[in-house]
């Protein structure tokens, strides 16, 4: 019993250290009256600090509720906040739940005429303020709701509120990683004293620029395909030196002489008969005028 207690205590301490490193304990400058019970203190700059011991206990409670659902497909984990979409997809991958990353389509839980209509048994959200539409629809359908709540988050229609920083990309990834590991431990997939081989970095939000490899630079085609640089022959032939007269061929074509200039229009010779029997062209008649 003592060994199990020490193992659980050491694991709890390690989780709290990880949450401190991911800034899970940092709240906002505003505090809802329903979140005051989870606040440890207030800093001089007005930022509220969460009690991470209560955050860890709420994570354990949420994991017990998730394990109580027989079919993981009846669980929907959703995040409209961009920082939580990657964490939502990873959580659904390891726990078997359904993930909705992005904007919530109104009527998904209430309108039976929609093709995306579903009736989940449990709804897990990242931010009650951002995901207010699924919270309202879940309340109309009597769906239990688990949400990560900041100090300024509204708690209406939220059944289990996990006090944590739900605005940082490291904080959201750390929370979903801890929740997924607790669920797998309670299901028996991994032992309680065993370290999970999945890194928490996989749950963090990544910028689109970070997904590209750093060494993706433009290279020359010959370097890419292993071809040598092209060599152009005839380098000695293309010279700018003057060519001597003796190098030119001896038999050159005689230049074409210019036609003799006629004195007037009437002095020009009449055209000869064309080949093939055609007669010579008749010269035009001169019009008689009275100008003298």
Swiss-Prot record:
InterPro entries referenced in this protein's UniProt entry, alphabetically: Ribosomal_uS2, Ribosomal_uS2_CS, Ribosomal_uS2_euk, Ribosomal_uS2_euk/arc, Ribosomal_uS2_flav_dom_sf
Region annotated Disordered, chain positions: 256-292
Compositionally biased spans, kind Low complexity: 269-281
Cellular compartments per GO CC: cytosolic small ribosomal subunit
Keyword annotations: Cytoplasm, Ribonucleoprotein, Ribosomal protein
Signal peptide range: none
Primary site of residence: cytoplasm
Gene Ontology BP terms: ribosomal small subunit assembly; translation
Intracellular or extracellular location(s): Cytoplasm
PROSITE patterns assigned to the protein according to its UniProt record, in alphabetical order: RIBOSOMAL_S2_1, RIBOSOMAL_S2_2
Job of this protein: Required for the assembly and/or stability of the 40S ribosomal subunit. Required for the processing of the 20S rRNA-precursor to mature 18S rRNA in a late step of the maturation of 40S ribosomal subunits.
Complex formation: Component of the small ribosomal subunit. Mature ribosomes consist of a small (40S) and a large (60S) subunit. The 40S subunit contains about 33 different proteins and 1 molecule of RNA (18S). The 60S subunit contains about 49 different proteins and 3 molecules of RNA (25S, 5.8S and 5S). Interacts with ribosomal protein S21.
UniProt record similarity statement: Belongs to the universal ribosomal protein uS2 family.
Stated name of the protein: Small ribosomal subunit protein uS2
Protein species of origin: Brassica napus (Rape)
